[in-house]
Amino acid sequence: MSESAKNFRFLRLEVWQEGRKLYRLVSALVRKFPREEMFGLTSQMRRSARSVCANIAEGSGRNSDRDFAQFVEIAYGSAAEVASDAYLAFDEGYITEAEREELLAAVEIIVSKASGLYRKLNPAASGIQRSALRAPRTNP
């Protein structure tokens, strides 16, 4: 890591590092989507995954933990969007069940780390209100 990069707090945050992995995973998967999805689901999934990293980075540069916590909450929401899009991509036949599960597992790591970071930044809060990201197994 370069000397100047060490000044970026977000590089040391596990949630940002996991977000970066998610972005690479999403980028690899959407390459095989049909061309007609280029400005639809392909673009949306990439933007949502990128938003995880962007919001953690932006929040880490803020002057207060309260402000940072707000950006962590937005990053959490962006990760949830990726989870939703994983189901839609699977429903359309763009990804396999195994690929969907890989995306959901990556999102689960991010929301867990985001929730922990949120609690650390905002001790008075009990954490981001987290509902299950996974649908009941009755209808995959």
Name these PLM-found stretches.
Residues 1-140:
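Amphipathic alpha-helical assembly/interaction segments
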